[in-house]
Amino acid sequence: MPKSESHGVTINYDIEGQGPPLVLVHGFSGNRNSWRGYGFVDPLKTEYQLILIDARGHGESSKPHDPDAYDYRLLVDDVIAVIDDLNLTTVSYLGYSMGGTIGFGLGKYYPQRVQSLIVGGCSPFNRTDPTEPSPMLDLYEQAADQGVELIIDTFKIWFGSITPEYEARLRNADVRAAAAQLRWMQDHSPDYGNDLSAMTMPFLIYIGEADEPAEAQECATRLPNATFVMLPGLNHVQAAGASELLVPHIKTFLAETL
């Protein structure tokens, strides 16, 4: 299984399909196989070379327990390390939630390396107060001592239900690494709002209607070249797996931008 080295950590990835390269990075608590479970890989690999990355702290990549190891600039560099190892000059990119925030970082720091960006379930703005309580951070820091069942039980309350595949991923996660990443995000979450006007590559922005979409909509209006897709009635978790709705939009967007 191919791996890359980046800032002292190992980044794991898979390659499927043939065609123009499309990098995929999952959301927090996911891994490269999330895209398979959600039904994105099979319809996309017939037209694109899919590069499915385990972000640091996830899957089979390294899982540091130091919050500073999860600086988003490092996560952006991890993607570049992979595409450098593959001798790719430019790629298209698909990221959801955490993976979407990494996408905005690519647009800021490495605009010459991305032909187009597909970003879902996230905002480029940091309008949160780091002194305000973070229920997610509190949950993971408690679970680091009490066990992962606390996370699973709480998520079932928060989201109504979770899929067996998602529950299995939670059980296999390194809770202390996840808590470290959430701690960095709480204290230092990036704000790319002032950088949007300089990101001139094509963007496809998508979000669930029940996932507080106002900031994603604002983002799409401030980007010079963006298409916006709202997924009716879907929350954050549901939108992550909405491949039947999203794949047609993704294929149309990539056909127009490659």
Predicted features along the sequence, with ranges:
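Flexible "cap/lid" loop of the alpha/beta hydrolase fold
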Residues: 104-109, 115-145
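Catalytic active-site module of serine/aspartate enzymes centered on a nucleophile-bearing elbow/loop
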Residues: 226, 232-258
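Active-site loop/oxyanion-hole signature of alpha/beta-hydrolase fold enzymes
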Residues: 42-45, 51-92
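Conserved alpha/beta-hydrolase "acid-adjacent" motif
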Residues: 210-218
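Gly/Ala-rich beta-loop-alpha elbow adjacent to hydrolase catalytic centers
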Residues: 95, 99, 103
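Conserved alpha/beta-hydrolase catalytic His-Asp/Glu region
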Residues: 128-134, 145-195
